[in-house]
């Protein structure tokens, strides 16, 4: 690395992809164990492994980018392309859930009563908690944009304030979603309606939690003066991801909550 004559970052061997894959296996197996055998041991182990992996992987990336200067303009360009491709893959991921929903709702089978929502299902009122959730996420989209503009202008105080507001709104959204799940008059086992509703909104909720974690890391980094107006890709990637989560929710709200009810 001392005699490097190019702008690319030759990454050192890292154990974190392996421990990350292991934690994913433990969490998915743990979910199955929790659903079928009411045991949370494997799920807890998976979550702990995942959190430790995230902490140490993020620590390495922060060290390489902020303190060692490995994230040159060329490397940042590659990271941008990577994040864009990741978000595109997420678009296709959610497209599958929308496909399942519309496939079932546009031509409901006789087993469902020939109608949508199926006979016996009482859907949630889209003008109550779901509408509040929509306004909360839209407000968070405004505040994350405010944070980005403040960072570009070098206004650290406003950037931290806006980022804190965004994180708070993300946590509030998660709490509202949890209360909605708790009070819902149907479950994930209530046929195709319950399956599509909880899988689509549940995966979106998981993405909100991931996005909130991403923003919390950015907030802690900004407290330590890691970002400048021309070197802040970590925050930029978090903002892109958050806007993606916002847009997915709008489609979910219109499709599943409003039209689907």
From Swiss-Prot:
Q: What molecular function terms (GO) are annotated for this protein?
A: cytochrome-c oxidase activity
Q: Which residues lie on this side of the membrane: Mitochondrial intermembrane?
A: 35-40, 106-128, 184-190, 257-261
- Name the UniProt key words of this record, in alphabetical order: Membrane, Mitochondrion, Mitochondrion inner membrane, Translocase, Transmembrane, Transmembrane helix
Instruction: Describe the reaction catalysed, as an equation.
Output: 4 Fe(II)-[cytochrome c] + O2 + 8 H(+)(in) = 4 Fe(III)-[cytochrome c] + 2 H2O + 4 H(+)(out)
Q: Which CDD domains does the record cross-reference, listed alphabetically?
A: Cyt_c_Oxidase_III
Q: Which domain of life is it from?
A: Eukaryota
Gene Ontology CC terms, in alphabetical order: mitochondrial inner membrane; respiratory chain complex IV
Q: Which Gene3D superfamilies match?
A: 1.10.287.70, Cytochrome c oxidase, subunit III, four-helix bundle (1.20.120.80)
Q: Pfam families annotated for this entry?
A: COX3
Residue ranges crossing the lipid bilayer per the database entry: 16-34, 41-66, 73-105, 129-152, 156-183, 191-223, 233-256
Task: Give residue spans on the Mitochondrial matrix membrane side.
Answer: 1-15, 67-72, 153-155, 224-232
Q: Where in the cell is it found?
A: Mitochondrion inner membrane
Annotated GO biological process: mitochondrial electron transport, cytochrome c to oxygen; respiratory chain complex IV assembly
In the Enzyme Commission scheme, what number(s) does this protein have?
A: 7.1.1.9
Q: Which InterPro entries match?
A: Cyt_c/ubiquinol_Oxase_su3, Cyt_c_oxase_su3_dom, Cyt_c_oxidase-like_su3, Cyt_c_oxidase_su3-like_sf, Cyt_c_oxidase_su3_a-hlx
Topology relative to the lipid bilayer, per the entry, is:
Multi-pass membrane protein
What PROSITE patterns does its record include? Answer: COX3 (PS50253)
Please give the function described in this protein's UniProt entry: Component of the cytochrome c oxidase, the last enzyme in the mitochondrial electron transport chain which drives oxidative phosphorylation. The respiratory chain contains 3 multisubunit complexes succinate dehydrogenase (complex II, CII), ubiquinol-cytochrome c oxidoreductase (cytochrome b-c1 complex, complex III, CIII) and cytochrome c oxidase (complex IV, CIV), that cooperate to transfer electrons derived from NADH and succinate to molecular oxygen, creating an electrochemical gradient over the inner membrane that drives transmembrane transport and the ATP synthase.
Alphabetized PANTHER family for the sequence: CYTOCHROME C OXIDASE SUBUNIT 3, CYTOCHROME C OXIDASE SUBUNIT III
Family, per entry: Belongs to the cytochrome c oxidase subunit 3 family.
Task: Give the record's subunit note.
Answer: Component of the cytochrome c oxidase (complex IV, CIV), a multisubunit enzyme composed of 14 subunits. The complex is composed of a catalytic core of 3 subunits MT-CO1, MT-CO2 and MT-CO3, encoded in the mitochondrial DNA, and 11 supernumerary subunits COX4I, COX5A, COX5B, COX6A, COX6B, COX6C, COX7A, COX7B, COX7C, COX8 and NDUFA4, which are encoded in the nuclear genome.
Q: What is this protein called?
A: Cytochrome c oxidase subunit 3
Taxonomic lineage of the native organism: Eukaryota, Metazoa, Chordata, Craniata, Vertebrata
Q: Which gene encodes it?
A: MT-CO3
